[in-house]
A protein has these predicted regions:
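Active-site flanking residues adjacent to catalytic metal/cofactor-binding acidic residues
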Residues: 22, 62-63, 91-93
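A short acidic, Gly/Pro-enriched loop at the edge of an enzyme's catalytic core
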Residues: 52-68
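Nucleotide-sugar donor-binding/catalytic module of glycosyltransferases
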Residues: 40-43, 60, 71
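Alpha-helix C-terminal capping segments
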Residues: 32-35, 51-56, 102-106
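SAM cofactor-binding core of SAM-dependent methyltransferases
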Residues: 1-51
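Short conserved AdoMet
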Residues: 14-15, 56, 84
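Conserved strand-to-helix beginnings and helix N-cap segments that scaffold or border functional pockets
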Residues: 7, 55, 72-76
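C-terminal substrate-binding/active-site "lid" region of AdoMet-derived donor-dependent transferases
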Residues: 67-131
């Protein structure tokens, strides 16, 4: 979420939704969450299991943090209990060296969207919680 631009876009696109963000250093944000009434930002390590206590049930999560598979999977494991049935969890920028491991995990559908920006790290791991 670095810089906060993605949260700002989501806040504008979905003004009736509650948008929650997590960053390890909120001083890096280039937006002021006080200007967005539907936005709440937490400062924490993405692998901190206590963050779950601060969150409501969630319908959509996009994780674009450290880009390291162990961190991403740890975050998924922490947040998965907070996903409503049918909720979607997207891990962005899955590096090519982790592609096979996510596929082997079996919970994620994999999408290669490198054609969108012609960037090597534009691969998504997408989980949909069963109804």
């Amino acid at each position: 979420m670095s810089w906060g631009g993605g949260m700002q876009i989501l806040s504008e696109l979905y003004p009736d939704s509650n948008i929650y963000g997590l960053d390890w250093d909120v001083s890096l944000l280039r937006i002021d969450p006080k200007n967005w009434s539907n936005m709440t930002i937490f400062e924490a390590d993405q692998r901190d299991p206590t963050i779950i206590d601060k969150l409501p049930m969630l319908d959509f999560v996009t994780e674009d943090c450290s880009h390291q598979m162990p961190d991403s999977i740890a975050t998924f494991e922490i947040l998965e209990p907070k996903l409503n049935p049918g909720a979607v969890y997207v891990i962005e920028d899955v590096y090519p060296q982790f592609w096979d491991a996510y596929c082997a995990d079996g919970r994620f559908d994999m999408y290669d969207v490198t054609h969108v920006k012609d960037r090597a790290d534009d691969r998504l791991a997408v989980y949909t919680k069963p109804e």
